[in-house]
Amino acid sequence: FKAVVRENIAGRFAEWNTELETFVGTTSEVLIYCYQVWWERIGATKASGITKLMFSEAQNFPAIAQFYQQEVILPGRALIRRMLQRGMERGEFREMDLDYGTYIVLAPMMFLMLWNNSMGPCSLPDEVFTPEQYIRTQIDNILHGLCVRPAAGATPPPSQNP
């Protein structure tokens, strides 16, 4: 189990940190890129089932839960926190509680992993749920909450639909 987690998720944090450090563009563009890359590299793969497994079994295996926390949860939250901090420092994102801001970014990813590995297969045949469209909708929603708001009376910037 540990080897699978390290190979498929935890082992990618060095790569993701480098991508964040070298990214040229706005923090909104970084966020869009991160969601898209996460979906391609984790969410759309069998590795997404690891998170569902941890959701359902972590309380039964404290040592595995601690391992997952150290190898995946803490580095993931730190990476998201750095991205949000970058946006705040550049004046692109409004000031926020970064501890809770990370959960705002994580929640759509967690939902997709749970959906694909549990409720998705139970969907009605005519129900269309496209993960990519869900991600685009969530990005738009999150960015409208994170971005600096124009001063009263100012014209708002155009929507950035990815």
Residue map of PLM features:
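Amphipathic alpha-helical segments enriched in hydrophobic/aromatic and basic residues
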Residues: 1-8, 65, 69
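Short amphipathic alpha-helical interaction/hinge segments
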Residues: 5-16, 46, 62, 80, ...
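Hydrophobic alpha-helical connector segments
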Residues: 9, 15-51, 99-105, 135
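Short linear capping/connector segments at secondary-structure termini
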Residues: 15-20, 52-56, 69, 119-125
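Amphipathic alpha-helical packing segments from all-alpha helical-bundle domains
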Residues: 29, 40-49, 53-55, 63-89, ...
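C-terminal peripheral helix-coil segments that are non-catalytic and often amphipathic
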Residues: 29, 33, 37, 74, ...
